[in-house]
Amino acid sequence: MEQKFDSKETPNKYQQAFLESKVETNDAVVAAEVEKILKEHIAENDNKEVYQFLLNCVDLTTLSTTDSERSVAAFTKKVNDYWTNYPQYKNVAAICVYSNFAEVVRGALEVSDVNIAVCSAAFPSSQAHIETKVAETALAIEDGADEVDI
């Protein structure tokens, strides 16, 4: 896929990387390969074990602008109650929240096999001083984050 840029514009470093890339893609070929994989492997992967594995890979996430200590605690309670409601399945891998809610999740989380993941470093825009990003991330880890998404 060839990237096109206005000839009057100087490419930024990302555009330059695309311009210099030797990787070629063809949407029709990719679609055909996906269809082939689905036809050849759907039956062997359409089972409870695969579904359980996939569910156990999920980071259950709330990144709402309206998140609060109360809403995040209620969200965490759903994970705590999961085995009561669905004892036949493994729990999710992690609860993911904004970094300032790591301590809320740590205080409310009652199951030991679920990690606490946070989005940090001025997520989602990352428009902040590097010192701010480092401090935010350090505080999230101090507050109980097991994983940090940047």
Q: Which residues does each predicted region cover?
A:
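Alpha/beta enzyme core
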Residues: 41-55, 66-90, 100-150
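Short, hydrophobic beta-strand segments that form beta-sheet elements in well-ordered domains
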Residues: 95-97
